[in-house]
């Protein structure tokens, strides 16, 4: 009987600086913001602006934010990603599947390049790439695909691989989100679904990210039985001067109390791991924003992180590719 092939699994995410210092953050941001999937401006205009103004200013400011949330295990994103890796490895081991799970960051470390090398060194015969972005966007999932392809470009013997494009309406994902909300949402709280934004221009060029976000939101709303006046979908973390997907999370929270929304719970379904954008921007900055503009109470519902239902969902996505 032929022995089943050893499967390599890449848990892919955006990435994180190596340390909470301006120098390390500048190096990370350079890698991130020079990816044309993220910023598609002409290099001759963008690179000088990035080097002379954006990186020096943003690196110092962001360093303070990272320092406030940094842990002994590194950034929250990296620390939780390691826990996810271990939990998924244990889940797959319990299914008697011969696998090796690696973390693969698009930017920073552990890099996609190093993760792929680890798999090849251990002679896996097939690779499954799981970008931890439930909703597809060219600037996230697309960037993972580019990084994966780049990591394999020198390989003469290209291994069979599967690339999980999205899972925005996967039943296990929707159930995990709904269950996470159920145990935390109070009966008198308004529920805000906040997704990371992208430039509106990208949508006009064919990126269907907003539609995926909408489908996720509607599926969860239906699961929870919410009425139209109990929830809203917004977009956060805009960067630069051009128009991004709207409504903007921060602007909505500024005006929420005036719309008679006094108590609010915010969830970020597009984030599989809590990170700077959820911990600092949503749980701190926007909490203050809401409360300072007449709001009474504010709750951030954490990312699914290493909840059992989340790990099981990942495992089932992998198993589906093996059947």
UniProtKB/Swiss-Prot annotation:
An example GO CC term for this entry is: cytoplasm
Keywords, alphabetical: Cytoplasm, Heme biosynthesis, Iron, Lyase, Metal-binding, Porphyrin biosynthesis
Report residues binding Fe cation: 196, 277
The catalytic activity of this protein is classed by the Enzyme Commission as: 4.98.1.1
Q: Which SUPFAM superfamilies match?
A: Chelatase
Sorted alphabetically, the Gene Ontology BP terms of this entry are: heme biosynthetic process
Q: Which PROSITE patterns match?
A: FERROCHELATASE
Protein's pathway: Porphyrin-containing compound metabolism; protoheme biosynthesis; protoheme from protoporphyrin-IX: step 1/1
Does the record's keyword annotation contain Transport? no
UniProt cross-references to Pfam families, sorted A to Z: Ferrochelatase
Q: Which InterPro entries match?
A: Ferrochelatase, Ferrochelatase_AS, Ferrochelatase_C, Ferrochelatase_N
Alphabetical list of PANTHER family matching this protein = FERROCHELATASE, FERROCHELATASE, MITOCHONDRIAL
Its function, per the record, reads:
Catalyzes the ferrous insertion into protoporphyrin IX.
Q: What is this protein called?
A: Ferrochelatase
